Design a protein with these regions (language model features):
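Exposed loop/turn and edge beta-strand positions of beta-sandwich/beta-sheet ligand-binding modules
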Residues: 40, 73, 116
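Short beta->alpha transition motifs characteristic of CBS
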Residues: 113-116, 133-139
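N-terminal beta-strand motif that seeds the catalytic metal site of vicinal oxygen chelate
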Residues: 1-19, 74-79, 135-139
Length: 139
């Protein structure tokens, strides 16, 4: 007998300021917000494709990553996009740069990653690491 997984259902991450996180995930990244059950704590849910979600939870202890920059070896989740080029252009239009002095606006790009698919890494406002990847390099 095996676990027999269907898919990754959701990832939950701690956030310290829900309004700021909603602006980042909803307004900036353009993820559609989902209806969230009436829990006794604040949060927001976002769709990341069919039957997959990102759950933001306001958590007093925040994140373990305070003061850290973008590090692909740290805890992170990945969003697969259709076009690496389009994602890179979108992030640059939002102000992300590889040489940004502000960690929150710095992106780390790895178009020919050892993993076998192109990757971009950024931080959310609470310094949670987000990987954005594509099936292939389309630069």
């Amino acid at each position: 007998m095996a676990l027999d997984p269907e898919s990754l259902h959701h990832v939950s991450i701690p956030v310290s300021d829900l309004a700021r996180s909603r602006r980042f995930y909803g307004d900036m990244l353009g993820l559609p917000e989902m209806t969230r059950p009436p829990f006794d704590f604040p949060g927001a849910w976002y769709s990341i494709g069919p039957n997959q979600a990102l759950h933001l939870i306001v958590y007093a202890n925040q994140t373990f990553r305070t003061g850290k920059g973008v590090d692909s070896r740290d805890i992170h989740y990945a969003i697969r996009v259709k076009s690496y080029r389009q994602a890179l252009e979108f992030l640059r239009a939002q102000g992300y740069r590889e040489d940004a002095t502000d960690d929150l606006m710095r992106m780390r790009i790895n178009p020919r990653a050892t993993a076998g698919f192109p990757q971009i890494y950024i931080l959310d406002p609470d310094r949670n690491v987000i990987e954005i990847n594509a099936r292939e390099l389309d630069l």
